[in-house]
């Protein structure tokens, strides 16, 4: 495959010196872009868009044509695995994802297959291969999956939920049953992510969107333990380079030390956690990614610049920071405001890396 021309993201996730802080956005390929909305209308459905490698490739590349980003992230959905398990995924207007066959019993769990990522999920790995070819080494490609706990909430509830009542009832009444489901989903997720890496993904993110809904000890038992298992079993080198893994638990600020001990390379932070305090807590064990409040992008470009400056100052000098939002970019955000954020990172972050760049230059000299 092509030689990587911009490796800032991979270097930052390994806490190596960079000339400026790398930047990308969660959901950077999505509804806030008019070109995405046009292609989505042509495709006719979200599943057609995500399930067609050529279309998924085009959507993945769209934000890179607009913005000087330091990474591409695969356009897909976290629910591809339960869909491949036969749960019958549909997206309903105004309601979101719905499963026709939710998992509610021991028999349901027993009959769940572990999908072959090069069979039932071949459209994803084909998209990864196509994107890598089209990127031609410009920036690294991030692959991803949902955490087992987050996927289980959808599989048990049958869709989105505000209180996770069925899932939490199983957690408290039948914990062993939930563990059996999580074990199977973790197996499937590990195979799926390793297939993405084999196809060309150069970094991996695990999105634990609903881990923050768990009680303190329940998070460790029912979410973090399974993410740690996945991290331990992932392929960690491809194309002669380390493949970094980032864990992101929304609302996960209280568990940062435990998350850093999983063997991952980086932690994604939402906007409720102070970046500088997080850095003090985890030390140099992991890189940190984040964590601008996505709603800042509704504000003026001047305010956006000031808030970018605050996030950069919170982290402080030195390597190990990837600038990102604290969650996905909202559909109503003006694209120019995303551009203002990216420009501000480019302009304001080099000063935080000057000493490291000088030291690296002296070492190489």
Swiss-Prot record:
InterPro entries attached to this UniProt entry: UROD/MetE-like_sf, Uroporphyrinogen_deCO2ase_HemE, Uroporphyrinogen_deCOase
GO cellular component, one term: cytosol
Top-rank taxon, per record: Bacteria
Keyword annotations of the record: Cytoplasm, Decarboxylase, Lyase, Porphyrin biosynthesis
Pathway connected to this protein: Porphyrin-containing compound metabolism; protoporphyrin-IX biosynthesis; coproporphyrinogen-III from 5-aminolevulinate: step 4/4
Residues carrying the site annotation Transition state stabilizer: 77
Catalytic EC class: lyase
Sites where the protein binds substrate: 27-31, 77, 154, 209, 327
SUBUNIT field: Homodimer.
Record-stated family: Belongs to the uroporphyrinogen decarboxylase family.
Name of the protein this chain belongs to: Uroporphyrinogen decarboxylase
Organism of provenance: Alkalilimnicola ehrlichii (strain ATCC BAA-1101 / DSM 17681 / MLHE-1)
Originating gene: hemE
